[in-house]
Amino acid sequence: EERPLAVLLDGEFWAQSMPVWPVLTSLTHRQQLPPAVYVLIDAIDTTHRAHELPCNADFWLAVQQELLPLVKAIAPFSDRADRTVVAGQSFGGLSALYAGLHWPERFGCVLSQSGSYWWPHRGGQQEGVLLEKLKAGEVSAEGLRIVLEAGIREPMIMRANQALYAQLHPIKESIFWRQVDGGHDALCWRGGLMQGLIDLWQPLFHDRS
C-alpha cells in the first residue's frame, strides 16, 4: 500500500478542539493532498505532554514499534520515509524534528510549527539541546524535507527557530521556512499545517506518472 502517512501530535486538539477532518477531506477531493492515513496521537494531559514530547526516544520507539503496526493492520500505509510526515506545534514541533533527525529512514518529512527549540533552557539564554547536537554533528538533517514555521509575535520561539534555520542552511533547498504574523496561536497553526502537508507531499503527485 502506497498511501502516505501523517502523524499529528496533540491529536485530540486537531480531532476535537479544532477539527481538521473537513479541510483535509476538501483538500483531498480537490487533489491538493493525496489520499493518506492520518494518525492523531493524544497528549493525554500537560504532564504527559511535557515528559513525552521533548526529545524523548522512548516515546518515538513506542510509536514505531507499538502504535504504527496496529494502525497498519487497520489502514495500510507506505513505509517510505519520503511519504511520511510527522507534524507538531510547540513541544510537538521540537518532537517532530527530533523524530526526523533520529529516525530519518521512517520519518522523512518534518512539519514543525512554533517549535520549542529553546528546550530545555526556557530563559532562551542558552541554545537548545537539538541545536547543540546539530552543531556538534551528532545528528544530521541531510535527506529530510522540513517545514519550519514560527510567529513574529513569539520572540523566544522565533529566535530559536531562526538559529535552527541558520544551522540548517546547507540543506536550505529542502526547507520551507515561514515567518508568520502571529504568535503561539492555533488559528495560525491550522492554516500552516494544511499548507505544510501540501508542500511536503507535492512531489508525490509527480511520482504518479
Q: What are these language model-derived features?
A:
Residues 1-209:
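Non-catalytic cap/lid and distal C-terminal segments of serine-dependent acyl enzymes
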